Curated annotation (Swiss-Prot):
The gene is leuS. Pfam families: Anticodon_1, tRNA-synt_1, tRNA-synt_1_2, tRNA-synt_1g. GO terms for cellular component: cytosol. This is Leucine--tRNA ligase. InterPro entries: aa-tRNA-synth_I_CS, aa-tRNA-synth_Ia, Leu-tRNA-ligase, Leu_tRNA-synth_edit, M/V/L/I-tRNA-synth_anticd-bd, Methionyl/Leucyl_tRNA_Synth, Rossmann-like_a/b/a_fold, tRNAsynth_Ia_anticodon-bd. The keyword Nucleotide-binding applies. One of its GO terms (biological process) is leucyl-tRNA aminoacylation. It catalyses: tRNA(Leu) + L-leucine + ATP = L-leucyl-tRNA(Leu) + AMP + diphosphate. ATP binds at residue 634. It is found in: Cytoplasm. Keywords: Aminoacyl-tRNA synthetase, ATP-binding, Cytoplasm, Ligase, Nucleotide-binding, Protein biosynthesis. A motif ('KMSKS' region) lies at residues 631-635. PROSITE patterns: AA_TRNA_LIGASE_I. It comes from Mesorhizobium japonicum (strain LMG 29417 / CECT 9101 / MAFF 303099).
Length: 875
């Protein structure tokens, strides 16, 4: 009888080696079984992973192992999203080359992931900084150029004058560069763009067909694409400004035109620039605006400011009515025409602006049934539906009808021999700017020639490799100052030319990697046959923070790759799941006001003093403040490394805990107590199986219909069916709860087996039940499952065995319980044979004591029976 404790440190490496030797997880493209592609968003090799990172990999692994057992040819690959700024920062701070830093981190993190026992196809591994990978990315780029999906144009960017680089909107904090602290400038730079707007309508329409995506993600993408139907109105200028006669404004609410009290233009609008030429104060204001972040979020949170240019426009329906034109810091040139008309009564931002600058507020929409004479707007705009007021010929109309009426009338009026207005569909989505003034990224394969212009690098000359001999001793892009790399001959005329020194946005790298995994050995970016067979990804797993950009860019890429013949599909991901985070409390000594030090969980001990938890820094004995539960992050040091758990408890404990306590879409709190509890259950499973194994090893699974053996079989098969359904729905915590239930069911029978007290029928039922238990735990605790199977006499691996099939006859209850109501109020229940007819149900209900008491000896007026559901007695 085996009674030793299960030793994960000995067991887990043994089974990982066994799986690797048999290459169980290497998918074959020619396998005739039905395909299933499960993928977790691949990691950035930042140095080390923490336990929070592994939660989504564990989720994907459970699905992969389950689907293999169900007979699918499963592709479950892993790679590295390896380009990006952190490597350059490390190069500057630590005097280490980005390539060396990146590949060292990959080696470390690969070993960390392998310790977790993930069933990954490592044969397909690649990093996006591998020359083989970015060579194919350059091939795609040139195909996109040829197809007209790439353009080069001027765009406003956040420029850090100290680091001499473009910053993403998220890297601008309070108007300063996140790293240098320098005041950020808005500059016009000529950059490369992917024409994602060519697919805007399709990207929007196709969201409807993504049935296995979270609704919130689809809504976020819908809002980002931002389709609107509106009117482009040409407002006449009261007097010409440097040859300009009109101001074009796009609006989705032309019905509110009689509520207009001002116009606002972006700081870089042509009208603003011309007005600033003769107005130094305006020029200074425009310069201030240019030091703000360019993101919509930055503009929404910033104080709304404006500057009256002195320019006036004439109202389209009243020549005697003029409105002031302001330069405003909340208007972006990239949206619409870079100009808006402000209707304060119907928009809160416009109302705040009008109140700040003393502009008129004219209510033009009020609730139906309201009093137009008394209806006023002061501090809160009215943004709901209603009826038009104070709008002359529009009064009494609904806004939709007023929209059409304004459009019809202005389309008939002319200004400069053109209609004063035209209907227009607008999108918030903008073309994707991919230029980055950085070294550690995929080089853009273009060449600048003074005679031929910008020409592509011939495919035969690819890849354009990054030079290794670069230095990071000063800010800016090392490629710009490389003595030889950027000097090249023009492929068209042969004269001296220079390479493009911008590299691609790292979002490009992650926008097609899922396709490369289908045939990473192919010379072309994809093997179309393999890509079309494997794609779309059946289950994609990753954080909600990627709901917009990464997922939208990937959807664009599959469309662009279809247009260029690399794949024959539009949508990359069939099913999408956004998992919650692993959170941990924080510890800090010194406090926020004193720039206190963050401590890692390993640096503190938790004490219980008079019922209150205290954190003590081990090294100093100083008390640390215990903070709230937060996402694990290096900056606050509240991370737990996988080794902290696997060295003591084993990988299966970590896997079990991450999936057991919370729904997978919710956050899970990592605690030492939780880890200890998961480990205790692992040991309990081992004891249950190993103590009965000596007897059960020689027993064959046997069917039983009655007695204790029948009850064991029935409970086991019902749980088997339920666990399969739970995993299919990614309800991992529910599946685990049912495994706990099965362990409880089997505790007494297995103890009887171990003690020699079980008859042959119970032994046969227990052998079958234990086999099922082993297979049920295998997706979550695969190492323990293999150890249990070996102990039971198994000679093969659980990882290559099929998922057990439940007996349909055992999962159907022979009885049904009806809630019984009297006059619509529940009084009790009736349990009766499931196949009882309505007459038998009615007879049994009327015989119940609480029903007879309610009827007081009288016959019921009616008995309503909803089969298999509910009974209502009407007295």
């Amino acid at each position: 009888m085996a009674t030793e404790r299960y030793n994960p440190r000995a067991s887990e490496p043994k089974w990982q080696k066994a799986w690797a030797e048999k290459k169980l997880f290497e998918a074959r493209n020619d396998d005739p079984k039905p395909k299933y592609y499960v993928l977790e968003m691949f990691p950035y090799p930042s140095g080390r992973i923490h336990i929070g990172h592994t939660r989504n990999y564990t989720m994907g692994d459970v699905v992969a192992r389950y689907k293999r057992a169900k007979g699918f040819n499963v592709l479950h690959p892993m790679g590295w999203d390896a380009f990006g700024m952190p490597a350059e920062n490390a190069a500057m701070q630590n005097k280490v080359h980005p390539k060396e830093w990146t590949y060292q981190n990959i080696a470390t993190m690969r070993e960390q992931l392998k310790v977790m026992g993930l069933s990954l196809d490592w044969a397909r591994e690649f990093a996006t900084c591998d020359v083989d990978y970015y060579h194919r990315q350059q091939m795609l780029f040139l195909d996109f150029v040829e197809k007209g999906l790439v353009t080069r144009k001027s765009s406003k960017v956040n420029w850090d004058p100290e680091d001499m680089t473009v910053l993403a909107n998220e890297q601008v904090i309070d108007g300063r560069g996140w790293r240098s602290g320098a005041l950020v400038e808005q500059r016009e730079l000529t950059q490369w763009f992917f024409k994602i707007t060519d697919f805007a309508q399709d990207l929007l329409d196709s969201l409807e067909g993504l049935d296995e995506w979270p609704e919130k993600v689809k809504l976020m993408q819908q809002n980002w694409i931002g389709r609107s139907e509106g009117l482009l109105i040409r407002w006449p200028l009261a007097s010409d400004v440097a040859g300009e006669h009109e101001l074009e404004v796009y609006t989705t609410r032309p019905d509110t035109i009689f509520g207009a009290s001002f116009m606002a233009v972006a700081a870089d609008h042509p009208l603003a620039k011309k007005a600033a030429e003769t107005n130094p104060a305006l020029a200074k204001f425009i310069d201030e605006v240019r030091h703000m972040g360019t993101s919509v979020a930055a503009l929404e949170t910033a104080e709304k400011k404006g500057f009256d240019t002195g320019i006036r426009v004439v109202h389209p329906f009243d020549d005697s009515w003029t409105l002031p034109v302001y330069v405003a810091n909340f208007v972006l040139m990239e949206y619409g025409t870079g100009a808006i008309f402000g209707c304060p009564s119907g928009d809160q931002r416009d109302l705040d602006f009008a109140n700040k600058y003393g502009l008129p507020v004219i209510p033009v929409v009020m609730p139906e049934g309201g009093d137009a004479k008394s209806f006023q707007i002061t501090e809160e705009a009215y943004v709901d539906d209603g009826v038009m007021i104070n709008s002359r010929f529009l009064d009494g109309m609904k806004p939709d009808r007023a929209f059409d009426e304004v459009a019809k009338l202005l389309e008939q009026k002319t200004i400069g021999n053109r209609p004063m207005a035209e209907r227009k569909v607008n999108f918030r989505l903008r073309d994707w700017g991919i230029s980055r003034q950085r070294y550690w990224g995929c080089p853009i394969p273009m060449i600048h020639c003074e005679d031929c212009g910008v020409v592509p690098v011939p495919k035969a000359d690819l890849p354009v490799k990054l030079p290794d001999d670069v230095d990071f001793d000063r800010p800016g892009n090392p490629l710009d100052r490389h003595p030889t790399w950027r000097h090249v001959k023009c492929p068209q005329c042969g004269r001296d030319a220079r390479r493009e020194t911008d590299t691609m946005d790292t979002f490009v790298d992650s926008s097609w990697y899922f396709a490369r995994f289908t045939a990473p050995w192919a010379y072309e970016p994809t093997d179309p046959r393999a890509a079309n067979e494997w794609l779309p990804v059946d289950q994609y797993i990753g954080g909600i923070e990627h709901a917009i950009l990464h997922l939208l860019y990937s959807r664009f890429f599959t469309r662009a790759m279809r247009a260029t013949g690399h794949v024959d599909l539009a949508e990359p991901f069939k099913g999408l799941f956004t998992q919650g985070m692993v959170v941990h409390e924080t510890y800090r000594v010194g406090g926020a006001s004193n720039n206190g030090r963050w401590l890692s969980p390993a640096e503190v001990r938790i004490e219980d003093a008079e019922g209150k938890r205290r954190a003590i820094e081990i090294a100093t004995g100083e008390e640390a403040a215990i903070g709230s539960l937060e996402k694990m992050s290096k900056s606050k040091k509240n991370t737990v490394s996988p080794e902290d758990i696997t060295d003591g408890y084993g990988a299966d404990t970590a896997r079990w805990l991450m999936l057991s306590d919370s729904p997978p879409e919710g956050d899970v709190e990592w605690t030492d107590d939780g880890a200890a509890g998961a480990h205790r259950f692992m040991q309990r499973i081992w004891r249950l199986v190993s103590t009965a194994a000596e007897t059960l090893a020689g027993v064959k699974p046997a069917a039983a219909d009655s007695g204790e053996a029948g009850a064991v079989r029935k409970a086991t098969h019902k749980i088997l069916k339920a666990v399969g359904e739970d995993i299919e729905k990614l309800g991992f915590n529910r599946a685990i709860a049912r495994i706990y239930e099965l362990a409880n069911v089997l505790t007494t029978p297995l103890n009887q087996v171990a003690e020699g007290k079980a008859d042959p029928a119970l032994q046969g039922a227990c052998r079958e039940a234990v086999e099922i238990l082993v297979h049920l735990i295998a997706p979550v605790m695969p190492h323990l499952a293999e150890e249990c199977w070996e102990t039971l006499g198994g000679t093969d691996l659980v990882a290559e065995r099929p998922w057990p099939a439940f007996d349909p006859a055992l999962v159907v209850d022979n009885e049904v319980t009806y809630p019984v109501q009297v006059n619509g109020k529940k009084r009790g229940d009736l349990t009766i044979a499931r196949d009882a007819d309505q007459g038998a149900v009615e007879k049994a209900v009327l015989a119940l004591d609480f029903v007879q008491k309610a009827l007081e000896g009288k016959a019921p007026r009616k008995v309503i029976i909803v089969p298999q559901r509910i009974v209502n007695v009407v007295a």
